[in-house]
Swiss-Prot record:
The gene is Isc1. Gene3D superfamilies: Isochorismatase-like (3.40.50.850). This is Secreted isochorismatase effector Isc1. Induction: Expression is up-regulated during the infection stages. It is an enzyme of class 3 (hydrolase). PANTHER family: HYDROLASE, ISOCHORISMATASE DOMAIN-CONTAINING PROTEIN 2. Changing C124A: Impairs the isochorismatase activity and reduces the virulence. The active site is at D25, K90, C124.
């Protein structure tokens, strides 16, 4: 069993019962200030929907919410019926503040794979990733659900994250990894979710800024 667990970690497998979804600081104030934010919101929302289908808990943070506002309405609305979601406000850039770490260790100690979405890739997402890696978590950064103020900062940060040992994935790939099998009871719903997701253009596939 120990050998299997080690191999699973090395390969970066995503399994619902050992995973948690992190949504980092996708706040109203960043509309118009973040490269391809509509794509980030859409991708993050698809991840939230998949988490609800597959019983993956969600951890959401806001950065200095009293000044910078709440999570964008599209995501907040989708989270309303999530069975396991906790929202934390913070001042530190990393999501792994003591309250979040306590929530993880107390309520979900078996969940050691973190799917990470949000902004900004070169600041809060990067620092969250490094802190999680330092604590022994596998980190899967969902590349079409993270961004920065500029395309350059996003690209640089993804490379830095890769250098540190995290996995870079996509919305579609991560969800199919979690589902794992066309025999999954939720596969029809997952397939429909992916089809709906792909109807919206991925802004990171183009040079246009939205």
């Amino acid at each position: 069993m120990a050998a299997l667990s080690s191999a699973t970690k090395r390969l970066g497998r995503l399994i619902p019962h050992s995973s948690v979804l992190f949504v980092c600081d996708v706040q109203e104030v960043f509309r118009g200030l973040t490269f391809q934010l509509p794509t980030v919101i859409h991708g993050t929302n698809t991840m939230v929907s998949a988490a609800k289908l597959l019983n993956v808990p969600v951890v959401v943070t806001t950065q200095y919410g009293s000044r910078l506002g709440s999570t964008v309405s599209e995501i907040s609305k989708n989270l309303e019926d999530a069975p396991d979601v906790k929202v934390f406000d913070k001042m530190k850039f990393s999501m792994l503040v003591p309250e979040v770490e306590r929530h993880l260790t107390t309520n979900m100690p078996q969940r050691k794979s973190v799917l990470l979405c949000g902004i900004e890739t070169h600041v809060c997402v990067l620092q969250t990733c490094l802190d999680l890696l330092d604590k022994g978590y596998d980190v899967h950064v969902v590349s079409d659900a993270v961004s920065s103020s500029t395309s350059y900062n996003r690209s640089m940060a993804l490379e830095r994250i890769r250098q540190s040992g995290a996995y870079i994935t996509s919305v579609e790939s991560a969800i199919f990894q979690l589902a794992n099998d066309a025999g999954n009871p939720e596969f029809k719903s997952i397939s429909k979710l992916i089809k709906e997701h792909l109807k919206v253009q991925n802004g990171f596939d183009t040079g246009a800024r939205i």
